Amino acid sequence: MCQDYDMKIVGEKPSSDIKKNKELYGDIAEYEREKANGNIGKSKKLGQILAKEFVSVCQKDELTVSEDYSENLITQKVLLLSFTVMAGLEEFCPNISVANAARSAFFDELNVLDKELFEKSSDTGAFSFYYLSFRRGTEVDRRVGQTFAMLC
């Protein structure tokens, strides 16, 4: 007979992991409420608009390789700009469900508009460093600047 010695007994309160996931991803009822009132649709449009603006900014002369700008510096500028969009959505959307819908639409539209830029702007390693700086809550601008300098 098979024994399961590592079985854990769960108490009546939800675990901290469940609470943390709900904070990060929202819940189904919240999503349905936001969808019904039109906020999900609006946030998807916002994500698409932001992607178009992002591509426009990134294709300007100051974000192309030249004597003054190396490939790595350009990549880091793109990552920082992409992170800024993500942090702005998280900060200014009314809740995480709306922010996640806008975030998904941003990356979906970016992938359609410019695959190379999409790949440059979604480096999860660099994003982790930026999010650590952002979520600390104090001196965010200084910490994000230090992160940018470190990655360059």
Regions found by a protein language model. Name each.
Residues 89, 93, 114, 118-129:
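Membrane-helix exit/interface motif
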Residues 122-152:
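Low-complexity intrinsically disordered segments
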Residues 22-69:
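Short N-terminal edge-element motif at the start of the domain
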Residues 21, 43, 47, 51, ...:
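Short runs of predominantly hydrophobic/aromatic residues within well-ordered alpha helices
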Residues 53-98:
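N-terminal interaction modules that seed assembly of large macromolecular complexes
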Residues 57, 61-65, 113, 117, ...:
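Short secondary-structure junctions and interdomain/linker hinges
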Residues 98-123:
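Mature extracellular/secreted ectodomains of secretory-pathway proteins
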Residues 2-42, 126-137:
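Long, acidic, intrinsically disordered low-complexity segments
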